[in-house]
Amino acid sequence: MMHLLNRWGRCGGRYLAACLLATLALAGAAAAGPAEAPPPGMTMVTFNLHHDREDWPARREVILRELKALRPDAIALQEVIQKPKVRNQAQWLARKLGYDYQFVSTDPPGASKRYGNALLTARPVLARNDHLLAPLTDYRTVAHLRIAVDGQPVNVYATHLNERSDDSGSRIRGEQVADLLAFIAATSDDAPVVIAGDFNALVDAGDLSALRNHYGDSYGSVHVNDLAAVSTLNRHYYQAPSRIDHIFFQQDRLIAREARLLFDQPYAEGRWASDHYGVWTRLQFAPPSAAPAATAP
């Protein structure tokens, strides 16, 4: 600090104020030290696009603007459609964002209309897979990308489960969760796992219990005391709050640090980005567990 005061003392009269401000700025910078790098991790978004209903050309610009501002590492999309006069929605967003993408549908390539799920990423892709979930009569899928996040591989999965609210729907979702977990076990290659999508079930529903036995709920982990009235179904379209869109994470490898809703305000009077809200979360890599202490012979 003394050398800074000496420098101030050499300033001429009319430059005194400017020198004082510069000296104080340098002193503040010296006291603060180098800026700390954010802890390593990733951000992810999940969002049900509501396919091309209502005014898709206007909605897509709103969605694109928000995603450009956030620049998440990965984006899971549901209700993605392509058909005559509607370019594949995931492809359009990926191209505008400069992201890679993976689209999966039960409709065969070349069909005039295809409907399914997608993953978008700004990170290098190490592996990609897709899978048609059992039972095949329900037309549900999962997309998978293994991406490199600051040199560490992370598996991200996007899915959309059965929407029925009766006992049959619950049974089908349970079957889909079991198949999803088997697919993850076969493709994750011992890298951390994040699973995002529209699960059509509350996080504590019995349908998802097998999933919750292995993975944590990112939004619920961050907002543990403030969940009663939270909904990811857009309250403009649905009366009762229902949080059915989730980002699950592998709790022994990742930590949920932040989470919030997206697209939960109209972009114009009576106009919304979707009939769902999106979910954004920031995950941090968990520190490696300490090695067990050596025991005396």
Residue ranges with predicted function:
Residues A32-P34, A148, A185-V194, A201-P297:
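Metal-dependent phosphoester-hydrolase catalytic domains
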Residues W56, A74, Q78-L161, I255-F263:
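Structured beta-strand-rich core segments of catalytic domains in phosphoester-bond hydrolases
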Residues L4-G12, L16, L20, L26-K96, ...:
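N-terminal, active-site-proximal structural segment of metallo-dependent hydrolase catalytic domains
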Residues E36-P39, A69, A94-R95, G110-K113, ...:
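Extracellular/periplasmic catalytic domains that process cell-envelope and extracellular macromolecules
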Residues D55-A58, L132, D167-I172:
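Short, solvent-exposed loop/turn segments at secondary-structure boundaries
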Residues H160-L180, V203-R212:
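Active-site-proximal segments of metal-dependent phosphoesterases and phosphodiesterases across multiple
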Residues K68-P72, A94-G98, V125, A185-D189, ...:
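Sec-exported extracytoplasmic/periplasmic mature domains
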Residues M42-L49, I63-V86, L120, L145, ...:
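Active-site beta-strand/loop signature of hydrolases that rely on acidic residues for catalysis
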